[in-house]
Amino acid sequence: MPSTVLWATDIFGKVFTLSTDGQQWAPCKNGHVEFKRVSAVRSCCWGVGCNHQIYLYVHASDLPIRYQEETYENQRWNPVDGYCEKLLPSDRWQWSDVTGLRHQQLESFMLPSPHWEWESDWYVDENIGGEPTEKGGWTYAIDFPATYTKDKKWNSCVRRRRWIRYRKYKSRNTWAKIPSHEDNKKLPDPFNDITVGGWEITDEPVGRLSVWAASLQGKVWYREDVCQNIPEGSSWTELETPSEVIQISCGPNDLLWASLWEGQAMVREGINRNNPKGSSWTIVEAPTPENGIMHVSVGVNVVWAVTKDRKVWFRRGVNSHNPCGTGWIEMVGEMAMVDVGLNDQVFGVGYEDRAVYFRQGVTPSELSGKAWKSIVVPRGNERSNSESPNSLLSAGCFFGDEIKEHSDSPIPSDIESSSEPEQSAVQENSSDSSEPADVGPSQQDEPKDEELSAVLELDGQQKAGSSLSKDSGEDSAHSAGPVPKAGAPKWTSIDLLEARINPARASGDMTGLSTLGIFTAGEEESFVCETHPLWTWVSGGGCLVESHTPLKWFTLQTGLSASMQSLSLSITPAHTAAWRKQIFDQLSERSKRELDSFRHYEQAVEQSVWVKTGALQWYRDWKPNKWIDVRVALEQLTGTDGSRDSILFVYYTHGEEKKYIHIFLNEVTILVPVANEAKHSFAIYTPEKTKQRWPIRLAAATEQEMHDWLVLLSMSCYESRKLQGAPSSQAIWSVTCKGDIFVSEPKADLESVTNGRSCDQMFWRQIGGHLRMVESSSNGVVWGLGYDHTAWVYTGGYGGGFFPGIASSTDNIFPQTDTKCVYIYENQRWNPITGYSSTGLPTDRYMWSDASGLQECTKTNTKPPSPQWTWVSDWYIDFNVPGGTDREGWQFAADFPASYHGYKTIKDFVRRRRWARKCRIVTSGPWLEVPPICLWDISISPSSGAHNSESIALWAISNKGDVLCRLGVTKQSPSGSSWLHVGTDQPFISVSVGGCLQVWAIARDGSAFYRGSVSPAQPAGDCWYHIPSPHKQKLQQVSVGHTSVFVVDENGNLWFRHGITPTYPQGTTWEHMSNNIRKVSVGPLDQIWVIADKVQGSHSLSCGTVCHRLGVQPMQLKGHSWDYGIGGGWEHITVRGNRADMAKTLQPKENATEKPDPQEENGESAFSHIANC
């Protein structure tokens, strides 16, 4: 899991972040801005400065924030001038938007704020519907509202073309000021609080956020159009409120609460996907009438509040259907404020000590948690350059109390005669050295004038003063007006209470801010490191803390000398690994030395037998197929030479006759877990069972028992085949539709034309982890992608998951998580009485079903894919369905088996909508996460980077469709260093880089592109070349080998690109190769492997079968027939690492064993018994 950060501000307006895997507060670059409050999400942080202005901090990323501006140039044909800008009075504008209703000239487009810059000039889009247009980009139609085509016809009276220009957001890793409302008729309304959330309401547009703000006048404002491509939004909209608001908070979903001046809380209702601003307000009374609510914070299903007496309250019964909740529960502790982060985790700032606290024990079943625990990590060694004498006074306006001059100060005040650099330097020291104190509420008494000033005292030595003034930066270069004398009020607004400095808490003579003047620079720095920082605000909206996440926030390393700390820092993981290897080699040498002395003795036992028995269930072969109880026995024989052979016996009863079947484990090709809610089962394949598509299936009573048998049988198979250690760089990797990862070591003659061995004899072994796809290369660099689009890099280990101890490598095994969605469908039929309802015809599908409609799936009976998965969300309507939906998520059709669309017509008698629920798996494997960009597709050059330091080409597609090139990937550093963004005009879905750095990609509209001039010196190339797709086909995947290019379209057709040469790498034409293909992988020697559907077995058709193309030669890149391997239930395969040289002997054509393509059947596709894809 990648690290996330917790945000906080101290009493001097400085902003800090704390990483979930860190042990130190890191200062954030504030510039000259001091902050009152911050509200963070993962991608950014919004803040309110002490000047009551809104600021935005966007994290830097390798992926730029780009926004596409577009306009259309329209022309009409006339007999005199031909096509020209002279249009009819009833026509649209010459320059307009896509509808033609808005006038949009090129010169009218301006940058929305100083935080943007133009990426390029205007240019013409020469693409329409995935096909390239003629030069100039014109598309033609009979009239403007008609359908446009790229071909000019005799009746094409109008034409248009699209102009594109991109602008890029440049203010990243810095605070960008957001303007207030732009109504010149009204006075500016200073902001007092801000909150960010709402990212779970809808994902259209991508990265949409709800930003709410409260002003000093008690008004509520909503920021429009905040999303990934427009991080700062567009404008402010005021919402009417029944009373004045002092503070506001919104959660990830549709919860929004605000606290009022009268002490009540106010809840926004009606927030949904179509109305993110909500519709009405509801008042919620305070827990106690005498102490009103002064602060609220909301999450997904929780609301926390702090009342004026600093008591903390938890609101029970809160959810999307009841945002007001049912009642208040008082919690232990006194807080200045609380904040609810991700997963409803809670953070707070203590009232007395101003420390940041974390609520321990918060789980989905116990949302209120158990106890508060203080975060005690120190702050980083930052030197403030922007603090002024007004810093303390600005911070004081949050809390209403003051910082007083200590009565027994040993040195008289000299502030009136001090220069500004000296004041700034002393203020800098005081910012990190204030000690917390006991709090005395001052709500009843008016602060005295002398209590409203912070008296700072200086040492009279010129040397110390000049030394400190050097650190004050730019402040020393500007002169300021006279410092206000003691007794003058410094602020007027009161927000929260601040802690007084208690003399009893100071140590020695360090009793107050005035004592700081006696320190030299070095002494002051050591003093600062030992003091406790005073915090005013904390935000956990971007901090993800799981229940199993180990945090290092609650302990400090003490008692180590400087030399010991230096020694511990010098011990790296590489040193540890080297020591382990050295110890292992020494133990192995000693063991060998001791055993060699006795090898000449005769063995007492020539052969040993080891037997394990147990009770399982077996899915019998004959009809009716059902599970029956059996006894199993695993016999392992060890010969005198140490070789081991194993046999598995399955004893069953047929009628009244006792029978058995046996399996030689040296013939087993794969062991596949098939865990589901009904049975803890696994499948055993042999070459014969692979041909039949009917494995031997055994089931255990518990999941642990199933894992024990899988480990035992796997180890026996490894010993029979003398396999151990990690996979080689030549290995073939594959992934099942359940996310299980398997790897096979190819034989040297696998790609030979004279090889008589079928690929159904290949042995596959499981590697720990859970992935959606894997991409390998012959250099040993392997990457994988999870279902949640997280990228993982292979560490070189083996095992993990349920493989313990000796079955797994001790090094390079790390925790891994993955998240995916489970979908069910709600179906309805129209009738003239009730309209659409859940009452269907007797022949209709289930009203709650899976996608096929054949299996009933309700919200109650639908379980996670296996016991290893757990739900992490509730059911919600999924609007991202192919074909689109209406505002409520429905899709319409004439009947259930027909195609669906997102709008209702008079002929639509049925409708459906998809519900989704997220689940998560926690496992382990030889994988390390590559943050922070989520990826959709990935490709590694199969043959580059032969040397350890030579760069390896790696390209990827982000889950938003951006094309990326990974820099710094080598054998020694397989994860690389950074991403390089490659500009495109539209989102992409697939990319592949060949052995000679040929880069091909597929756009979301199904068009193909070739990237020109890619080289080690220019890893991103220079431009895209649009390649026409096969006629009326939308492509969805591409794979490039050494000299060949293959693509798969959305209908499962495999296409081969003809005419590719070094001088013309784009090729000339497409040729159809096969159908029923799901995925294709082309190796470094142009080997062709695919995942095919509808492969005939002995019992049914099999979907998701590994197939290998036979007869591939340098002069015959298409091969001649298919060889079928393991399956079904497979989702992905990669042979990009297999560089085993194929034999050059040509096989006579008449001797070639021709196998038919995967059959195209009119009936249903039956899945294998391994997994239901």
Swiss-Prot record:
Q: Which PROSITE patterns match?
A: PH_DOMAIN
**Gene3D superfamilies per UniProt:** Pleckstrin-homology domain (PH domain)/Phosphotyrosine-binding domain (PTB)
Under the heading InterPro entries, the entry gives: Beta-propeller_rpt_TECPR (IPR006624), Peroxin/Ferlin (IPR006614), PH-like_dom_sf (IPR011993), PH_domain (IPR001849), TECPR1-like_DysF (IPR010482), Tectonin_beta-propeller (IPR051513)
Q: Per UniProt, what is one Pfam family of this protein?
A: Hyd_WA
User: Where does this protein chiefly localize?
Assistant: membrane
What is the top-level taxon of the source organism?
Eukaryota
Record field: compositional bias (Low complexity): 409-422
GO BP annotations, alphabetical order: autophagosome maturation; autophagy
Q: Where in the cell is it found?
A: Cytoplasmic vesicle, Autophagosome membrane; Lysosome membrane
Q: Name one GO cellular component term.
A: lysosomal membrane
- What are the boundaries of the region Disordered? 403-489, 1147-1173
Molecular function (GO) terms for this protein are: phosphatidylinositol-3-phosphate binding
What does UniProt give as the signal peptide span?
Answer: none
The alphabetical list of record keywords is:
Autophagy, Cytoplasmic vesicle, Lipid-binding, Lysosome, Membrane, Repeat
Biased composition annotated in UniProt, kind: Polar residues:
424-434
The chain positions of domain PH read: 609-718
Q: What does this protein do?
A: Tethering factor involved in autophagy. Involved in autophagosome maturation by promoting the autophagosome fusion with lysosomes. Binds phosphatidylinositol-3-phosphate (PtdIns(3)P) present at the surface of autophagosomes.
By sequence similarity, the record places it as follows: Belongs to the TECPR1 family.
Its UniProt domain note says:
The PH domain mediates the binding to phosphatidylinositol-3-phosphate (PtdIns(3)P).
What name is this protein filed under?
A: Tectonin beta-propeller repeat-containing protein 1
**Originating species:** Xenopus tropicalis
Q: Which gene encodes it?
A: tecpr1
